[in-house]
Amino acid sequence: MWKIGCEKGVMKSLEDVIVDKICDLTNYMLSKIIKPDICVENVREINSKMIHTLKEQYGIEGVILDVDETIRKDLNKIPSCNKKWIESLKGELKVIIVTNGSDKDVEDFFRARDIDYIGFAHKPLKKNFMKACEKMNLPPDKVLVVGDRVFDDIYGGKRNNMRTALVKSVDEDER
């Protein structure tokens, strides 16, 4: 098996690199068709003022939050600035994590803060978006999906009648 691209000691196979590039291209093409309700540079732009507006305009009461490339870069730890943001968000809205990945340390971080975590979610399939709504005891139209992928997060939220926020990605200084 060919191995290329060594980032922080993680080797990727040629197949993984090709799949990543195809996913990036797919997301780019879909971003021309599927539009989020909100675009932000990073999650911290979703601040108290924006949350207040979302509550008033759309009746938002809960957030489905993605992990990788939304609140942390690659497979690194969640930066402290985003940990603080999550704590403040939790004070204003119901929060649940829905991610296609799974990381025991990240899951433990959220569970320790009484935030439900759904890993291996198979986004954009409807099942776990709806499961998240059930756990928050909210109808889909009262939920905001926050993520970095147009197909997985934005399309997944839209097809479930949810509001969506596209995060450009985690800033380098957030690492």
Which ranges hold each PLM region?
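Surface-exposed amphipathic alpha-helices with a cationic face
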Residues: K55, I86-G91, C133, K158
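Short, structured coil segments at secondary-structure junctions
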Residues: G91, A112-D114, N160-M162
